[in-house]
Amino acid sequence: MKKMHQIQEEENEKVVIFCPLNKEEDKDYQFAEISRLCFSAGMDVQKIFSQSLDAFNRRTIMGTGKLEEIKNYLKENPCDCLVVDFQLTGSQLRNISDELGIKVLDRILLIIDIFALNAKSSEGKIEVKLAQNKYLLTRLSSLQGSQGRFGGKGAGMRGPGETKIELDRRKLEKEIITLEAEIEKIKNSRRQNRILREK
């Protein structure tokens, strides 16, 4: 008699989106585009919040009322992550995450995460890791203490074989140099192979 194996599909991360709106951009197009990006990252979008950039808050990018609205929604509808359709500073990432108590991804980190999911070659995986490290390095001073909300299961600094996100400046800088050297080595090898084929 054959054994029956029940295959459980891993649930997609439940996310909410916040879109800062520019008067010159089409709101529906912006909503559709960021939703497609989230879908590509394996996310399940629960709700989209938006606010005019006129209400820009340097600390959290959104007004206090909007932040409270999202916080109240999350109390009733727990989600794994907030995706902000904007490039955030390290302090903004940390401030929003501290206010909401969940992981926060900005647009850049979301796109890097999609590349991580689709990277198949050795070079592709190295390039993803390099992009992640450079992203972290520019935001390092503000992200200290937020490590737990970047690593782990699901989207956000997802990478080949990574279980812990390194937030040490010297180690990051050293790894960036190593990764750049590895990429250059791969490119040189490819050039040499092409020259040999052409002979």
Could you describe each region identified by the protein language model?
Residues M1-R107, I111:
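N-terminal accessory targeting/assembly segments
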Residues D26, K125, K129-Q132, K164, ...:
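Alpha-helical initiation/capping and key positions within long helical/coiled-coil segments
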Residues L109-A131:
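Short alpha-helix plus adjacent loop in nuclease-associated cores
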Residues P20-K23, L88-G101, V128-L136, K153-G161, ...:
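Short secondary-structure transition/capping segments
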Residues I7-V15, L143, Q147-K199:
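Conserved G1/Walker A P-loop phosphate-binding module
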Residues L130, K134-G148:
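A charged, well-structured terminal subsegment
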Residues F18-N22, A55-R59, I112-A119, G154-R169:
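Short hinge/gating elements
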